[in-house]
A protein has these predicted regions:
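N-terminal leader/targeting and accessory segments in enzymes
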Residues: 1-100, 104, 219, 249, ...
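Nucleotide phosphate-binding/pyrophosphate-handling subdomain across enzymes
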Residues: 2-8, 18, 25-29, 256-258, ...
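Phosphate-binding loop of NTP-binding sites
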Residues: 25-31, 62-68, 79-222, 228-237, ...
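Short internal beta-strands
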Residues: 31-38, 220-224, 357-360, 382-392
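Beta-strand->loop->alpha-helix junctions that form or flank phosphate-binding loops
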Residues: 36-37, 55-60, 99-103, 144-146, ...
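C-terminal helical cap/extension that packs against the catalytic core
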Residues: 50, 237, 376-434
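Short acidic/histidine-rich motifs immediately flanking catalytic phosphotransfer sites
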Residues: 68-74, 163, 432-434
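Short, basic, low-complexity termini and linkers enriched in Ser/Thr/Gly/Pro
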Residues: 268-270, 432, 456-467
């Protein structure tokens, strides 16, 4: 099916962060766009406001007539939707063209110079940072992102003139094997998605295959020290990067007073005195990778310096909601033990003298089963942990796998509690909160506005009591 000539696109799972970028793309092309999602969210409401027709009931009768012609309709599927989904069964039984999100993304971006960011963690911030560096430069870019850019309020950037497309390359379900990168960063290969891959070896082999897809004339920029043997084609340059060493790295790092300055070192240049727009130490390494992609493709030194300073971050990625002398509250998407450890260490660096509390919602039964001890070790770096029930996403429960597995393995002496999501506000009322972070990739973020209100109310009452 020719994507240019189709008239309508139907999304089964329209509200996912990756799917919604494609929804926006097809709306920009003037297609009729409709779809199903499980629950309303601010993102699905935004998509409706932008012209998409989205419903929240698994019901074939709610599919618009414009999306019932198999000759002119493309159906896009997210792996999170079960195969027995009523609408998916309807499309399958009636001979519609059904493609995975990654397959569609690969087709759309095949004719452009794909700048892809892959890896277990860090890819959303790094790809969004890369997109910003290009978009604000003389080169520009199109971008399909895995998070909402705070600079642009969207996960889709469009350019009519740029040959470059920045893509977050997702390893789940081997999705990134549909891509044809011109250049790629690989940030990390810590094992994940073992429900799909089975073993760490298979997970690494998937990344090895991904490196074979990079086009001759392009480049691989791989984090120094990760356990991966790239298998690039002839004519593909291979570079290393990290915070402190590699072909691309940072030097003269200055952290203090809520600010971070670095010098960026490349094989053929040095850009001094770069100020990070989102001053958390984890963004030094993310920034090095983004600047490497920008530098290799002609973004000027001054454009890189200005872009790093004007970068405002990504929703749910070290996303500050309250930041004052009384209380700090932020939301973070970290859902893998390594990500949580990095996030906690970054917070500890910023607020070393304060009590740090986290509300953690584990994501997936399989991930909890496979990594509960690692989760407990990472969370034990905190002063206090509040655990809520596992967010199942696409999975059914596994007997014996609950948040209590993590709870029981937290370090002795840590303040800890367990509750249902609906009980979070009541739990917080009895606590002395100095720095609070919500962690997880599930729906914990839906509670962030209420948590913010409750914290502001608590601190106002404290002030009144003191006065």
């Amino acid at each position: 099916m020719n994507i240019e000539t189709i008239k309508s696109v139907y999304f089964v799972g329209a509200g996912g962060i990756g799917m919604s970028a494609l929804v926006r793309y097809f709306l920009s092309k003037g297609k009729v766009v409709a779809g199903y999602d499980r629950t309303p969210t601010p993102l699905t409401e935004n998509l409706i406001a932008e012209g998409a027709q989205i419903h929240y009931e698994e019901n074939v009768r709610l599919i618009p007539e414009a999306c019932k012609d198999k000759e002119s309709t493309l159906v896009v599927l997210t792996p999170a939707v079960p195969q027995e989904h009523e609408e998916l069964v309807y499309f399958r039984n009636n001979g519609f063209e059904i493609q995975k999100r990654a397959q569609v993304l690969g087709t759309i971006t095949h004719s452009s110079k794909g700048l892809c960011v892959a890896g277990t963690h860090g890819k959303t911030t790094t790809s969004t940072m890369t997109a910003h560096l290009f978009h604000q430069s003389h080169i520009e870019c199109t971008a399909f992102l895995g998070g909402i850019s705070k600079n642009y309020g969207t996960n889709l950037l469009l350019s009519q003139k740029s040959p470059y497309t920045v893509i977050e390359a997702d390893e789940f379900d081997r999705s990134f094997h549909w891509l044809s990168p011109y250049m790629s960063v690989i940030t990390a290969t810590d094992p994940d998605h073992l429900d799909i891959y089975g073993t760490e070896k298979a997970y690494l082999e998937s990344f090895e295959h991904y490196t074979t897809l990079i086009q001759p004339g392009g480049a691989l920029i791989i984090r120094k020290g990760i356990s991966l043997q790239p298998k690039v084609q002839a004519g593909v340059r291979v570079y290393t990067y990290s915070r402190d060493e590699g072909d691309f790295h940072a030097e003269n790092i200055r952290i203090g007073n809520g600010e971070i300055f670095i010098d960026f070192v490349a094989p053929d240049t040095r850009i001094n005195n770069i100020q990070l727009g989102v001053p958390v130490s984890i963004n030094i390494e993310n920034g090095v990778a983004a600047m490497a992609l920008a530098h290799l493709n002609g973004v000027t030194d001054e454009e890189i310096r200005q872009g790093m300073n004007s970068f405002r971050g990504v929703d749910r990625r070290f996303d500050f909601k309250i930041k004052n002398d009384q209380v700090v509250f932020l939301s973070d998407y970290a859902h893998h033990p390594s990500e949580i450890k990095q996030s906690v260490l970054s917070i500890r660096e910023l607020y070393e003298d304060k009590k740090i509390t986290a509300i953690f919602q584990p994501h997936l039964y399989t991930r909890t089963r496979d990594f509960y001890q690692d989760f407990a070790d990472s969370l034990s770096l905190l002063d206090e942990v509040i655990l809520v029930d596992i967010y199942p996403a696409r999975e059914t429960p596994i007997p014996g796998v609950t948040s209590k597995l993590i709870y029981d393995n937290l370090r002795p002496g840590i303040e800890k509690s367990m509750c249902k999501k609906e009980e979070i506000l009541n739990i917080l009322k009895d606590k002395n909160i100095e720095v609070l972070i919500t962690l997880g990739a599930g729906d914990i973020d839906n509670y962030v506005p209420e948590i913010k209100k409750e914290l502001e109310k608590m601190k106002n009452e404290e002030r009144r009591t003191k006065n």
